[in-house]
Amino acid sequence: MDKRENTASHVLARFRGFIQAAATLVTNIHLPNFAKGGIYQGAGKTVCVPGLNCYSCPAASGACPIGSFQSVVGSSKFNFSYYVTGTLILIGVLLGRFVCGFLCPFGWLQELLHKIPGKKFSTKRLKALTYIKYFVLLFAVVLLPVLVVNDLGMGDPFFCKYVCPQGVLEGAIPLAIANAGIRSALGQLFTWKLAVLIAVVVLSVLFYRPFCKWICPLGAFYALMNKVSLLGIRVDACKCVSCGKCSKVCQMDVDVVRAPNHAECIRCGKCIGACPVDAISYRYGLDVSAEKLPLTADKK
């Protein structure tokens, strides 16, 4: 493993929090719009941001890829969203779930909530719940907007309308605070979405990134690309001493030695910092050498 590569990996992992904050700010750069009660509608809204960030957020500088995809597949013309799908595939191939670990505002929020002092619970025995997000992607994002339509042939953006807590947090709540007309129009749907948001907030305090692990369709899409993405995690078999510290520190419940580029790995780099022999690093490119060992990390 190249020494410069290892050093760069440690630096990237160490400054992840700053990168998350910067990514959130860039994704929501139009902060004065919170006071104005309006949303930015400029040219930037024709570009999809990589993470989950509501189009209706007053500060949003770009479009949410999930919302953009649903607005097209649910239209009466039923045009397949080549642009959005192509953008997602490109990001997935280049970065995989690095987006979740470094660039997603809602992922960062869940991490901050989990830092609130109190009893925490492991999700290792709840791994079956990670498959829910794939059903959300297939049904709530793709199939239902196409199959369930009104008399005009228009489908609802089911995930954005009925599930996504980010839409309430970034869009509905700040817009309702600033606009009396919007406040007066709030009804049962807002109450339901607010309940979803509260549930996610509470769960995020107790569990590490529950929405990312179990519900997020964007995370599900990037997870499908994780093993083929150019940015990944490398474990040097010659250096690894099978101490198991990497897997113990992983809050995404990944067996780092056995499957360093598992679908649930968000490239957070905690395993890199935990390794006592510097056997783990980020890698970029098609090189998959020294990527896994035959034994799990907790065996010697």
Predicted features, each with a name:
Residues 1-257, 263-300:
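Non-ligating segments of multi-cofactor redox enzymes
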